Amino acid sequence: MRLTIRTPARSIGAALGAGILAAACGGSASLETPTATPTATATTTAAVTTASAGAWTLTDKSKATIRVREQLVGVSLPSDAVLTATGAKGSFELNADGTFTSGSMITFDLTTLSSDERDRDNFIKNDTLQVRQFPTAQFVPTKTSGLTLPLAASGTFSFTLTGNMTIRGKTKEVTFDVTAKRDGGDLTATATANPSWKFGDFGMTAPSVPFRVLSVTDEIRAVIDIVATGPTS
């Protein structure tokens, strides 16, 4: 995503080179003049610089959403528990070959996880995720597939994103199906985990709450919504 699509983006760009400019001019003194005119020489050299054209920075509108199927006591049909985490931070940038630069990372504050049920939120955060010890989740993007680079200055793009997700101190390589839209220096993207995750992938067990939850399906469906700003071209 130059998603920098980290265009990660995190659209998504590559490093630009800079050139060296040099110019010189000179003059000489006349022998017929009693007082010699000093020779004047001026030289101008521009410094060599390398500017990044692909760095995208997340805004506070970015979020992560997880869905888990649960069967509640006294409810005839199962339903989805939907929890959302905000407090996203980070940046990302793509290389010309579709990989990401070192330092590309997205971090979500798991202490902000919330749903429509406070008791569920507290159980998930304190017992399942153990947010006091592991308050954040980190995603380090490593490569894209199916993304044409360099990314056009505007348009929509679909591709696969691969990276390393760390939750509760355990890291797993994951893939996302991504749909992104770029409008100059603004980038939005929705990344859906495919395949979905198991609780055991991150050293967790499916939640179990006596007298409240009959069962929880061992499947985590994760979606990351990215809103980022970056280069305009």
Specify the residue positions occupied by each region the protein language model found:
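C-terminal motif of bacterial Sec signal peptides marking the signal peptidase cleavage site
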Residues: L21-A24
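Bacterial N-terminal signal peptides that target proteins for export
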Residues: R2-G13
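Low-complexity, acidic/polar, glycine-enriched regions of mature
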Residues: G26-S233
